[in-house]
Amino acid sequence: MKNVGIDIIEINRMQLKAKLIERYLSEEEAIQLQRLQSEVGKKQFLASRWALKEAIFKALPFEHLVFSEINITKNKYGQPTVKIKDYQISLSLSHNQTNVIAIAVIF
């Protein structure tokens, strides 16, 4: 059985507030965010992580997920990856200047 989750978010709606960052990003992701120079880049990064985690949450509706405990990384090809329990999860992420869309497929 496959479960699918999709999320889209407007980048400009992201607010770079400490409380929001602490709640939605893992420690590693928060460090990556701090290393980014531009506010636009930071908002895009936060929006991408938020959208990916929301898509995962929607695909796994019966799992108790804490967003700050989910760490999204990139594989050698630059694709987002995540490890949650024994699930096989495929992630896809795309964006333009205004929106980020994320898809999570659970196998």
PLM regions and their residue ranges:
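Core catalytic alpha/beta fold that binds nucleotide/phospho-ligands
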Residues: 1-107
